[in-house]
Structure formats: C-alpha cells, structure tokens
A protein has these predicted regions:
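Short-chain dehydrogenase/reductase
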Residues: 1-11, 44-48, 70-71, 109
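Flexible, glycine-rich beta-alpha linker
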Residues: 1-2, 23-46, 68
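Active-site Tyr-X1-5-Lys
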Residues: 1-31, 51-56
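A generic fold-level signal
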Residues: 5, 22, 42-45, 54, ...
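A generic local structural motif
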Residues: 16, 47-48, 129-130
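Histidine kinase transmitter module recognition
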Residues: 20, 38-39, 91, 157
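C-terminal substrate-binding subdomain of Rossmann-fold SDR/epimerase-dehydratase oxidoreductases
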Residues: 54-202
Length: 202
C-alpha cells in the first residue's frame, strides 16, 4: 500500500544520500511503531481523540477498528532513541543504519478496538460510544515493524507490554481529566520510575 511504500522510499532516499553525498557524515534513521503515552494531544490519533471525546461528551469515530498496529509506550521509544544517539556518538560508522523500534511479542498485537476496550477498563471516566466509519483511503489491516537490529545492536527491547503501556497512559490521562493533579510532577515521576525499571533490568 502507498503508506508502507512511502516508508521504504524514505529509507532508500536516506541510504542513497548517506552513501553518495554524506560519506563523511554518519546518519541513522529511526522509526517507531504506533506510540501512546501521556501528554499527546495531536489530532487524528486514537488516544488523544478518545480523551477529546470524553471531554466533549461526543462519539469517538474509529476508521479501522479491526486493524492491528505495533503499539509502544512513548518512554520505550525515547529510551531507544537515546540509546541510538549514544551509539552514534560512540560508534558512528557502524550505527549509521535504519532502526525500527516496536513490540517484539505477538501477545502485544492489539487491534484498534481492543485498545479502546482496554482503555475503557483502565480509565475512571466513562467513555462515550464509538462510531465506525469506512476509511477514505486504503490502509493495511496489519502493521508490524522488525526491531531485531535495535534488539541486537543497541540491546534495546520494550520494557512495557502493550497492556502495561495502556495502563501507564490511562493513568496519566486520568490525572489530566481530574484537573487537580500536577501533570509536570506526574510526568517526571513516570520518567523516574521508568529509569529505575530499566536500571534494575540491566
């Protein structure tokens, strides 16, 4: 499909420039799966759209409820990017490659509908009903990224399962919806806890 082809074309263009014009510069590309986590309010993204529907008490429109996406918590993604940046600094020539960051467990394959159902269980606020519409453009039913290079070269793998990523994300947005919690403090505490987990696993 055009979406997937565009990603492959981007990698070909980066590789061509890296080898042809930037031979003295070491460039890596990084691509993550479908990222969820507190603090995201972008439009046309499933979790922010869900939170807006709760605030506005309006139906949530889902285009592809049965499509599977590689869901990943934002802290797992950022940790991977930091590891890649460190590797580029330490071993620039060998790190100048294309890296994917995504779940590597098939148990983490959640459909869009399953994500919403999981949030329904975790959020303390009632979720408005969902409306299903046909997508205007073709989209793949099943998207997955191969993160084996990041696993092998950066020793990276996601700390969170999809269920845990949903739990952490729902907790952050619960705090946001209550309007009585210091979100900066909550975010810093989440980062600190995440780093404690990574340090204990290393």
């Amino acid at each position: 499909d055009p979406y997937s082809a565009s990603k492959a074309m981007a990698e070909l263009a980066i590789s061509a420039y890296r080898k042809s014009f930037f031979d003295s510069k070491y460039i890596a590309s990084a691509r993550a799966g479908n990222v969820i986590g507190g603090g995201d309010f972008a439009r046309y993204r499933i979790v922010p759209d869900l939170i807006r529907s709760i605030e506005e008490q309006s139906p949530l429109t889902l285009r592809n409820p049965h499509s599977t996406r590689p869901w990943l918590h934002v802290l797992d993604v950022l940790y991977g990017y930091l590891l890649l940046g460190k590797k580029l600094f330490e071993e620039p020539e060998s790190a100048a490659q294309a890296f994917n960051f995504a779940p590597d467990r098939t148990a983490d394959d959640y459909t869009v509908k399953a994500i919403i159902e999981a949030f329904k269980d975790k959020l303390s606020t009632e979720i408005p009903k969902c409306e299903f519409t046909k997508p205007k453009h073709h989209e793949s039913k099943y998207l997955k990224l191969d993160s084996s290079l990041a696993n092998r070269f950066l020793y990276w793998s996601p700390i969170f399962t999809t269920a845990q990523a949903i739990e952490w994300t729902a907790r952050w947005y619960d705090s946001y919806l209550k309007k009585t919690v210091n979100l900066k403090k909550t975010t810093i505490e989440d980062i600190q806890t995440y780093l404690e987990i990574t340090n204990s696993d290393s």
